[in-house]
């Protein structure tokens, strides 16, 4: 098993953990569809910056 050479100080531990913080995702509203989406990503409808860039197939819903 690995054994540390010396004890890690609280300052060192904090410096190591300083990059572990979680941030909220940046959201935008598409000007065409009004849909909320992540910045710099295509919406679920296939729009990006107000233009249709991907043709989305219609989802199939099975009815019982």
From Swiss-Prot:
The keyword Cell inner membrane does not apply. This is Large ribosomal subunit protein bL32. GO terms for biological process: translation. The gene is rpmF. SUPFAM superfamilies: Zn-binding ribosomal proteins. It holds the Pfam family Ribosomal_L32p. It comes from Xylella fastidiosa (strain 9a5c). Belongs to the bacterial ribosomal protein bL32 family. GO terms for molecular function: structural constituent of ribosome. One of its GO terms (cellular component) is large ribosomal subunit. Residues 1-28 are annotated as: Disordered. InterPro entries: Ribosomal_bL32 (IPR002677), Ribosomal_bL32_bact (IPR044957), Ribosomal_zn-bd (IPR011332). Keywords: Ribonucleoprotein, Ribosomal protein.
């Amino acid at each position: 098993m690995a054994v540390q050479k010396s004890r890690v100080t609280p300052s060192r531990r904090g410096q190591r953990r300083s990059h572990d913080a979680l941030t909220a995702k940046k959201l935008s509203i598409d000007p065409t569809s009004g849909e909320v989406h992540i910045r710099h990503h295509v919406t679920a409808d296939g729009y990006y910056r107000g233009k249709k860039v991907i043709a989305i197939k219609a989802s199939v819903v099975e009815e019982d």
